[in-house]
Amino acid sequence: MSQSVPMTEEGYRSLQDELKHLIRVERPKVVQDIAEARSHGDLSENAEYDAAKNRQGFIEGRIKELNDKIARAEVIKPGDVVTDKIVFGASVTLFDVDTDSEVTYKIVGEDEADLKHGKISVTSPVGRALIGHRLDDEVRIKVPSGLKIYEVVNIAYM
């Protein structure tokens, strides 16, 4: 059996929205583009046709991928979590010992990760290192630039 894919409700909705858009908008558009390119004659040297067929392949592949992820989705509601440990869905504020600064991350599924918005994947090196820690724990994380040392100063589930 396939492994479940943990994600937040927001991430699940985002995948569903993308799937609907691909099926309702992008797929019909590319079919129309292929038909139009075909009408231009010789397909062997028709760049428009080749581009549209490539786009169709990408769209169909992405639809299949999204259907698979949605079917295997395990929606986790952070508000339902009762624990003092860092787990999936937690918003974690860390104090960087080296820079005397704080950073907050929300631990989310792979498809939801967006570092610009403070969302890190549960499978990322930082996400994996944080899982299971508690308030006031010191967390050592190996990053490309070396070893980072953080102190967990807040854990929230919203």
From Swiss-Prot:
Query: Highest taxon of the source?
Result: Bacteria
Report whether Transcription regulation shows up as a keyword of the record. Answer: yes
Q: Entry's Pfam families?
A: GreA_GreB, GreA_GreB_N
Which biological process terms from the Gene Ontology are attached to this UniProt entry? DNA-templated transcription elongation; regulation of DNA-templated transcription elongation
Identify the PROSITE patterns for this entry. GREAB_1 (PS00829), GREAB_2 (PS00830)
Gene3D superfamilies given for it? Transcription elongation factor, GreA/GreB, C-terminal domain (3.10.50.30), Transcription elongation factor, GreA/GreB, N-terminal domain (1.10.287.180)
Q: Which residues form a coiled coil?
A: 48-74
Q: Briefly, what is this protein's role?
A: Necessary for efficient RNA polymerase transcription elongation past template-encoded arresting sites. The arresting sites in DNA have the property of trapping a certain fraction of elongating RNA polymerases that pass through, resulting in locked ternary complexes. Cleavage of the nascent transcript by cleavage factors such as GreA or GreB allows the resumption of elongation from the new 3'terminus. GreA releases sequences of 2 to 3 nucleotides.
> Under what name is this protein listed?
Transcription elongation factor GreA
Instruction: Identify the species of origin.
Output: Syntrophotalea carbinolica (strain DSM 2380 / NBRC 103641 / GraBd1) (Pelobacter carbinolicus)
Q: What's the source species' lineage?
A: Bacteria, Pseudomonadati, Thermodesulfobacteriota, Desulfuromonadia, Desulfuromonadales
Gene responsible for this protein: greA
